[in-house]
Swiss-Prot record:
InterPro entries named among the record's database cross-references: Flagellin (IPR001492), Flagellin_C (IPR046358), Flagellin_C_sub2 (IPR042187), Flagellin_hook_IN_motif (IPR010810), Flagellin_N (IPR001029)
One Pfam family, short name: Flagellin_C
Subcellular location: Secreted; Bacterial flagellum
Keywords, ordered alphabetically: Bacterial flagellum, Secreted, Virulence
Organism, as annotated: Helicobacter pylori (strain ATCC 700392 / 26695)
Similarity-based family: Belongs to the bacterial flagellin family.
Any one GO MF annotation of this record: structural molecule activity
Function description: Flagellin is the subunit protein which polymerizes to form the filaments of bacterial flagella. Important for motility and virulence.
SUPFAM superfamilies in the record: Phase 1 flagellin (SSF64518)
Record text on subunit structure and interactions: Heteromer of FlaA and FlaB. FlaB is located proximal to the hook while the remainder of the filament is composed of the predominant FlaA.
The protein, known as: Flagellin B
Length: 514
């Protein structure tokens, strides 16, 4: 055993161990006071890098949730505004339905039209003023907007809201077959004219649909009335509704004279003597109407005193009489009734409540006037048109003109909006079309909102899990660290005692010098 004074190895060793114990004790106190296992890079360099990445991801996810909530707020703003617009459209249609009956006078229809115009102004006002944070929502400018809903770039949801102003919604496409003139040549006593089978092309943008063949004749259950019924039976599939107007009209007012051997649709009416000018006593119309249940044809006089024969169920109209009887009828569709029998087919109107074209082909489709070379009347209107006049083009495309005589009467159009019966029908279709368009936009917005809600739910859970993962790395385990602190505290105290003892040992050398 050796004794040295200059170098107290035991004291130095105790000091070194004590310094380390104090360092560990300070680190433990720092962790306990901050609640963090990693307070500086030296504590866990790789763990710190991972924890910092997770903290950034969690913060970004939190902002993504706020972004999604902002987007939901925008969507809900637009949705509530469109809900009000749909209520306006429902009111417009209700007023159009009210106007679509001839118990209304022109003045009462004008009052309804005035109400509708005010409603349209409010509809456009909603479209032009609805905004979120200064951005127009329903004017058509809100297109392809993106919302960041993730922690990393390009994790976005896109949203677009089409324009809901009256000039962008409520489209109605109308196509009416061409005038048939005197009509088609009637064959034999059965008055069987032709058979027609229509093929509607690219109904849904891809598929064609062919409907069953219909006989066009003067018999009951035939004609464009039967064709219209079949089309309407499958209107949901075809996307098209049909209506018809079969009418024969005199070119001039009824002339005085005698109609001999009058036959309508194969039913013999006989001779009508001493018909007065303009059929003043109703003799001619009464004779025709007395057998209307058998002929399917009803007679009336228009304001000019011209005779109109109207097919009740849409069958063709064939009129035949002895020589010179056509003059009494006033010519027009009756110009050749004393010669070879002809039939008036009438006009078929197809209506689609959107802006797409109606493409028709098929078997003998030209026989009902739907060949493009025959001058099909066609027109597309939108809801804004209700503010103006439905001109002659709209009147013809909507089927308001059954023949040339009616086209002449409606040469200036059919008036503004619901001021006419046919105009009220058009406005009803416009309101339906506009509501369908708004419902589609709202449906798309609803899908976006559901996507955003689902995203919020997902990233909220992800954010919690990311925070948990960060906590596992960065936060201190107090139970574990308390145990460490107790250990380091005891070691620090025992180290101080050991250092004191090591210094005291050197004093033993003095005993050797006594």
């Amino acid at each position: 055993m050796s004794f040295r004074i200059n170098t107290n190895i035991a004291a130095l060793t105790s000091h070194a161990v004590g310094v380390q114990n104090n360092r560990d004790l300070s680190s433990s106190l720092e962790k306990l006071s901050s609640g963090l296992r990693i307070n500086k890079a030296a504590d866990d360099s790789s763990g710190m890098a991972i924890a910092d990445s997770l903290r950034s991801q969690s913060a970004n996810l939190g902002q993504a949730i706020r972004n999604a909530n902002d987007a939901i707020g925008m969507v809900q703003t637009a949705d509530k505004a469109m809900d009000e617009q749909i209520k306006i459209l429902d009111t417009i249609k209700t007023k159009a339905v009210q106007a679509a009956q001839d118990g209304q006078t022109l003045e009462s229809r004008r009052a309804l039209q005035s109400d509708i115009q005010r409603l349209l102004e409010e509809l456009d006002n909603i479209a032009n003023t609805t905004s979120f944070n200064g951005q127009q929502m329903l004017s058509g400018s809100f297109s392809n907007k993106e919302f960041q809903i993730g922690a990393y770039s390009n994790a976005t949801v896109k949203a677009s809201i089409g324009s809901t102003s009256s000039d962008k919604i409520g489209h109605v496409r109308m196509e009416t077959s061409s005038f048939s003139g005197a009509g088609m040549l009637a064959s034999a006593a059965a008055q069987n004219l032709t058979e027609v089978g229509l093929n509607f092309k690219q109904v849904n943008g891809v598929n064609d649909y062919k409907i069953e063949t219909v006989r066009i004749s003067t018999s009951a259950g035939t004609g464009i009335g039967a064709l219209s019924e079949i089309i309407n039976r499958f209107s949901n599939t075809l996307g098209v509704r049909a209506s018809y107007n079969v009418m024969a009209t005199g070119g001039t007012p009824v002339q005085s004279g005698t109609v001999r051997e009058l036959t309508i649709n194969g039913v013999e009416i006989g001779t009508v003597n001493d018909v007065h000018k303009n059929d003043a006593d109703g003799r001619l119309t009464n004779a025709i109407n007395s057998v209307k249940d058998r002929t399917g044809v009803e007679a009336s006089l228009d304001i000019q005193g011209r005779i109109n024969l109207h097919s009740i169920d849409g069958r063709a109209i064939s009129v035949h009489a002895a020589s010179a009887s056509g003059q009494v009828f006033g010519g027009g569709n009756f110009a050749g009734i004393s010669g070879t029998q002809h039939a008036v087919i009438g006009r078929l109107t197809l209506t689609r409540t959107d802006a797409r074209d109606i493409i028709v082909s098929g078997v003998n489709f030209s026989h009902v006037g739907f060949h493009s070379a025959q001058g099909v009347a066609e027109y597309t209107v939108n809801l804004r048109a209700v503010r103006g006049i439905f001109d002659a083009n709209v009147a013809s495309a909507a089927g308001a003109n059954a023949n040339g005589a009616q086209a002449e009467t409606n040469s200036q159009g059919i008036g503004a909006g619901v001021t006419s019966l046919k105009g009220a029908m058009i406005v009803m279709d416009m309101a339906d079309s506009a509501r369908t368009q708004l419902d589609k936009i709202r449906s798309d917005m609803g899908s976006v909102q559901m996507e955003l809600v689902t995203t919020i739910n997902n990233i909220s859970v992800t954010q919690v899990n990311v925070k948990a993962a960060e906590s596992q790395i960065r936060d201190v385990d107090f139970a574990e660290e308390s145990a460490n602190f107790s250990k380091y505290n005891i070691l620090a105290q025992s180290g101080s005692f050991a250092m004191a003892q090591a210094n005291a040992v050197q004093q033993n050398v003095l005993r050797l010098l006594q």
